[in-house]
């Protein structure tokens, strides 16, 4: 009887370790970092805004949806951001470094994704007065994994991007649109491959079945010993 209980306890411990290991593996596969660049809208040319985005970004999959967490420097210059029509969800700020980290829902982690950015500057830059107020489209080029996908759909952004140039306080041009884009953003189709492997869900079921079988076996042996 003692040997049976020892085997039973060992089996239970092994099952717990196996389930914990595979759960951690599943979570690890659905989060990580990705490198990216910021392009002028609908081009392969690096945007002047690229330097204000810290790399790499972080990605995470929650409830079947994909999210990226992006950190910007010169945070007080960047008054608003959106990706695929999804407005930023600010998750942390560092006032001392003038940085903030924002989370966006996205349709994929690899390839081009369109976004919008609002910039307002009214201060001295390089010792000279500078005023800039502009809203324009940009394109993110994500270099993340292709095997992590979500059921995300592009959101709706009711803000139309501005075009043309802005005027400074002295009447001179201080900024220009990244691109003469149309009012409608182009969004590539989301990935359709599966996210979490099926075996991740099968392991707990198989473990439970094995546990039930062992329990019935121990009970049967116990009754036999009593009789």
Swiss-Prot record:
Q: What does this protein do?
A: Involved in heme (porphyrin) scavenging. Binds hemoglobin and almost exclusively free-base protoporphyrin IX. Probably has a role as the central conduit of the isd heme uptake system, i.e. mediates the transfer of the iron-containing nutrient from IsdABH to the membrane translocation system IsdDEF. Hemin-free IsdC (apo-IsdC) acquires hemin from hemin-containing IsdA (holo-IsdA) probably through the activated holo-IsdA-apo-IsdC complex and due to the higher affinity of apo-IsdC for the cofactor. The reaction is reversible.
- Binding site residues for heme: 47-48, 132, 136
Q: Where is the NEAT domain?
A: 29-150
Q: Where is the composition biased (Low complexity)?
A: 161-175
Q: Which Pfam families match?
A: NEAT
Q: How does it assemble?
A: Monomer. Interacts with IsdA.
This protein is called: Iron-regulated surface determinant protein C
Subcellular localization, per the record? Answer: Secreted, Cell wall
| SUPFAM superfamilies the record matches | NEAT domain-like
The opening ranks of the lineage are:
Bacteria, Bacillati, Bacillota, Bacilli, Bacillales
Q: Which gene encodes it?
A: isdC
One GO BP on record is: heme transport
Q: Does the keyword Signal apply?
A: yes
Q: What is its main location?
A: secreted
Disordered as annotated region, ranges:
149-191
Task: Motif NPQTN sorting signal: list the residue ranges.
Answer: 189-193
């Amino acid at each position: 009887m003692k040997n049976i209980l020892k085997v039973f306890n060992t089996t239970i411990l092994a099952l717990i370790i196996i389930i914990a290991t595979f759960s951690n593996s599943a979570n690890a596969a659905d989060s990580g970092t990705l490198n990216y660049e910021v392009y002028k809208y609908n081009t392969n040319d690096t945007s002047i805004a690229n330097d204000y985005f810290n790399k790499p970004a972080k990605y995470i999959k929650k409830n079947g949806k994909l999210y990226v967490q992006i950190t910007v420097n010169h945070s007080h210059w960047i008054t608003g951001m959106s990706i695929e029509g999804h407005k930023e969800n600010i998750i942390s700020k560092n006032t001392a470094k003038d940085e903030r980290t924002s989370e966006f829902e996205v349709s994929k982690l690899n390839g081009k994704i369109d976004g919008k950015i609002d910039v307002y500057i009214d201060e001295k830059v390089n010792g000279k007065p500078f005023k800039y107020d502009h809203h324009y489209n940009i394109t993110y080029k994500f270099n993340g994994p292709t095997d992590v996908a979500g059921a995300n759909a592009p959101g709706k952004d009711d803000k139309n991007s501005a075009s043309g140039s802005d005027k400074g306080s002295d009447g001179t041009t201080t900024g220009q649109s990244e691109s003469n884009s149309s009012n409608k953003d182009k969004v590539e189709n989301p990935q359709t491959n599966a996210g979490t492997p099926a075996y991740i869900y099968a392991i707990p079921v198989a473990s439970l079945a094995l546990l039930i079988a062992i329990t019935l076996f121990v009970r049967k042996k116990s009754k036999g010993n009593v009789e």
